[in-house]
UniProtKB/Swiss-Prot annotation:
It comes from Rhizobium meliloti (strain 1021). GO terms for biological process: polysaccharide biosynthetic process. This is Exopolysaccharide production negative regulator. SUPFAM superfamilies: HCP-like (SSF81901). The keyword Signal applies. Residues 1-22 form the signal peptide. Disulfide bonds: none annotated. Negatively modulates exopolysaccharide (EPS) biosynthesis. Pfam families: Sel1 (PF08238). The gene is exoR. Keywords: Exopolysaccharide synthesis, Signal.
Length: 268
C-alpha cells in the first residue's frame, strides 16, 4: 500500500475508533493450571494455545488466550478475536466489538512482506463491509464512499479477489460514487482470474446485457458449475433468467463455450 493511502486509511479508521471507544476487555480468569500457559506467557505462546483450544472446542479458553495475546500486540490474536465477535463464535455476537478490533489492526498498518499482511487485508475487507451497511444502534453509520475506498485498497494493492468483486459491484450500482461499468468489468475480470466464481457470473451478466448473449450466458453457466454452495442460489437465479431470454441457438453455443471456461484461466 502506498504511504499516502495508508496514512489516509489510518486517519479515517482512527477517527471512528476514537468515536466508538477502546476495545472492551472481557472478564479475566485464570487458565487451568495444566494448560501450560499463563496470562504472563508470550503473545505467540498464547496465540498457539488459543488456536489449539479453539480447534478442540474449548472456545472460552481460546477467547481468553486471544485477549491476553491481543493486549500484548499480537495481530493474529486480534484478528481471531474480532472474527469470533463478528460471527458470534464462542462469544455473544457483537459487531461493534469486532469493528473496534478490526479498526485497531488497520490502524496499526503492515510492513511490506510482513506475516501479518493477511490479517491486515482481512481487517480492511471486514471494515469495508461494516462501513457499507453500518451497525444499527451504534455510532458506526453507513459510509459508502469509505467502503469503496477500503475495497479499492485491498483490491489494488493486495489483489484480493473478494475485494475486487465487491468493488466491482459498487461500481456497477453507483454505491459510494459514480457508476463505471468499464472499471467494474476490469475488476470482475481480475477477480475471476483470481478464482472468484461470483465475479465470473456477474461479468457474464454484464456482457449479456451489453449484447454478447452467448458469451455472457456461457460465463454465467460456467460460474454456476464452479461456485461454492453459498453462491449457488443467486448465481442460479441470474443464469436461469438469462437462459430464458436467450435464443435456442445462443443457448447451445453458450453450453459448448462454458465447458472450456475455467476460473483463473485467461480465456476472455
Amino acid at each position: 500500500m502506498r504511504a499516502g493511502e495508508l496514512k489516509s486509511l489510518r486517519v479515517a479508521v482512527l477517527g471512528m475508533s476514537l468515536a466508538v471507544g477502546a476495545t472492551a476487555a472481557g472478564p479475566a480468569r485464570a487458565f487451568d493450571p495444566g494448560a501450560g500457559v499463563t496470562k504472563e506467557s508470550g503473545p505467540f505462546a498464547l496465540f498457539k494455545f488459543g488456536f489449539s483450544a479453539y480447534k478442540s472446542g474449548r472456545k472460552d479458553e481460546a477467547v481468553e488466550a486471544y485477549r491476553y495475546a491481543a493486549e500484548k500486540g499480537h495481530t493474529g490474536s486480534r484478528w481471531a478475536l474480532a472474527n469470533m465477535y463478528a460471527y458470534g463464535d464462542g462469544v455473544a455476537e457483537n459487531d461493534l466489538e469486532a469493528f473496534k478490533i478490526y479498526s485497531e489492526i488497520a490502524q496499526q498498518g503492515v510492513e511490506p512482506g510482513s506475516e501479518d499482511t493477511g490479517y491486515f487485508v482481512n481487517a480492511l475487507i471486514s471494515l469495508a463491509g461494516y462501513y457499507r451497511r453500518g451497525i444499527p444502534d451504534t455510532p458506526v453509520r453507513s459510509d459508502l464512499s469509505q467502503a469503496r475506498q477500503l475495497y479499492f485498497q485491498a483490491a489494488s494493492t493486495f489483489g484480493v479477489a473478494e475485494a475486487q468483486f465487491q468493488l466491482a459491484r459498487m461500481l456497477l450500482s453507483g454505491e459510494g460514487g459514480s457508476v463505471n461499468v468499464q472499471q467494474a468489468k476490469k475488476w470482475l475480470n481480475r477477480a475471476r482470474k483470481n478464482g472468484h466464481a461470483g465475479a465470473m457470473g456477474v461479468f457474464g451478466n454484464v456482457i449479456f446485457q451489453e449484447g454478447q448473449t452467448a458469451r455472457g450466458l456461457a460465463y454465467m453457466t460456467a460460474a454456476l458449475g464452479q461456485c461454492s454452495p453459498k453462491d449457488r442460489p443467486w448465481l442460479q437465479a441470474m443464469q436461469e433468467q438469462a437462459f430464458s431470454l436467450a435464443t435456442e441457438d445462443d443457448r447451445r453455443v453458450a453450453i459448448t463455450m462454458s465447458q472450456n471456461m475455467h476460473l483463473q484461466n485467461d480465456d476472455d
